[in-house]
């Protein structure tokens, strides 16, 4: 037995009445026009009644379909059926009225000539834009007008791919792909996010639900301690977080007062530490308490703390079993399409080791999570090594590259690779409140402290250290039984606790670099305690071309000193970059340091608050899943032309600016360059890291043919590179002045 809703019954009745009255109105119009042309009021009143019934009919149907989307691809029994129904109805009425008009016109005017004149003055309803009923019913008439694709550089290429490959996997048809351009566009905008959403399409209900979940800052660590207690591998990080807890809580409260942290979406975040898994073969967690490398653990603990305090939902994995458990919903999915439903994760923080584990675990589903990845990568990955086929063509054999990610998805320890993103870390202050009161009373001694806790770092450095010893005492913190490279006059304290090291630094005037290790946190700790840093200069610069340490790393970056960040972004009076083999230069620097009085200095970006600000900006603004979201804002763009032999990184740095790779796409067309007075008489597309570029003699422009190859690194031998630079906040290099 069939049941009908009152609304459907009402709309059917109204439809029947509308057709009936339409016919009656037409007949009466004919009658009144011939017999009673002096009474237009009656016809007008009847017309108003018909219009009123029509409005009620449309309103009834609209009420039935108020929650559905319009358009030929919206599905059956939706608002688009309303158009089909009205199309049939109106077509029927218009055909009848057209015939009536023709007959009435002939009867009234009597001649074809007059008829022509009359229709010129008052156009027939039928002569207006015709409605093709068959097209509407078949879903053809409503054209799929595509929105502008600005900011979605991959959209056009993906549409071309879909045209050829949409039958390669039945999942595309399950999502409504039917071979038409509009269905391709809907899939690529709503399922895979490569294209802008069509304006008439409803929003994804899962996205709407996600936006209802807002992040609220946290001011205690109870939940985080509970999560980390389950893993012995996290012991060192947990102790660091506990030591710094008060500073972190003060920082999040301070940041919340300075900028609006409300109405932020709470993200589901996976943190997978591949370097701590048993399968990695590393023993980092085991050696953390016995002089092993700590840089990665420092960065991971500070990242986890920041994500937690900013109010996001985090899940931490340090084993393959945990990773599989978290991602079990998509593990084994062989489909080329993403899984339907609520997202498991929205952001994934991972390292290079974990990246390989993650890809193997997910299988084909990997492609749907690539855009969510943020890869902790201390030394950086340049576009030349990230692009698999390009790296292959150049003969690069690094085991760490060829991931084909957006280069900005790699997060570095220092802001040394502008093609990547600067994540950083926090320089720890090991002192409690009573210590701080006492430490300010400590008088600086005429002494230096050498940066090098391993005996081998001191090899062949005696002549350099002798110069320093002429002017002051030399102290060290070398551990281990071997001290054969350490001069006899050095006072070695062995391994010190963080607190004791802080007191020693407060007594010291000079922190002495030996040239290795590269880019460590210790010089920043020394500067924060009021020491000057003697930073060894490298001439020629060190890179994978001349230094074994860098061989195999996915970068051709050249280090001009032991600590390029300190050299470029801090400088004198805190940092003195000198040639160790130039006695006069070393002596002059030591004398100047002894004669100066400097205050402790800590760049904001290496404080708890600075890191919270930076990570929050990245989470809120960086988006590699929805086309190229315009951040940093274009207002920060400053275009520079590099001379032949000069990279974009260099030319921007010379102007106290930063190369900003996200702006390259706005300099990759002839019309774009006209704004900056660069006129191309000819142009071509080329897939290389050295373009876009300009050859002044012939005014020939070369544009980028592969978006993953945009690069701030690399110098063209004959062309001028066209470089996108931006400003930055002093002490917060990752952010431009308009970025917050």
Swiss-Prot record:
Its EC number is 2.4.1.155. It catalyses: N(4)-{beta-D-GlcNAc-(1->2)-[beta-D-GlcNAc-(1->4)]-alpha-D-Man-(1->3)-[beta-D-GlcNAc-(1->2)-alpha-D-Man-(1->6)]-beta-D-Man-(1->4)-beta-D-GlcNAc-(1->4)-beta-D-GlcNAc}-L-asparaginyl-[protein] + UDP-N-acetyl-alpha-D-glucosamine = N(4)-{beta-D-GlcNAc-(1->2)-[beta-D-GlcNAc-(1->4)]-alpha-D-Man-(1->3)-[beta-D-GlcNAc-(1->2)-[beta-D-GlcNAc-(1->6)]-alpha-D-Man-(1->6)]-beta-D-Man-(1->4)-beta-D-GlcNAc-(1->4)-beta-D-GlcNAc}-L-asparaginyl-[protein] + UDP + H(+). InterPro entries: GT18_cat, MGAT5_Glycosyltransferase, MGT5A-like_N. Residues 212-740 are annotated as: Sufficient for catalytic activity. It is a single-pass type II membrane protein. The chain crosses the membrane at residues 14-30. Disulfide bonds join 144-182, 155-195, 171-337, 371-625, 648-723, 652-725, 659-712, 680-701, 736-739. The keyword Secreted applies. UDP-N-acetyl-alpha-D-glucosamine binds at residue 525. Detected in cerebellum. One of its GO terms (cellular component) is Golgi apparatus. Substrate binds at residues 377-378, 553. Residues 1-13 are cytoplasmic. Pathway: Protein modification; protein glycosylation. N-glycosylated. A secreted form is released from the membrane after cleavage by gamma-secretase. It is an enzyme of class 2 (transferase). It comes from the Eukaryota. Catalyzes the addition of N-acetylglucosamine (GlcNAc) in beta 1-6 linkage to the alpha-linked mannose of biantennary N-linked oligosaccharides. Catalyzes an important step in the biosynthesis of branched, complex-type N-glycans, such as those found on EGFR, TGFR (TGF-beta receptor) and CDH2. Via its role in the biosynthesis of complex N-glycans, plays an important role in the activation of cellular signaling pathways, reorganization of the actin cytoskeleton, cell-cell adhesion and cell migration. This is Alpha-1,6-mannosylglycoprotein 6-beta-N-acetylglucosaminyltransferase A. It comes from Mus musculus. The gene is Mgat5.
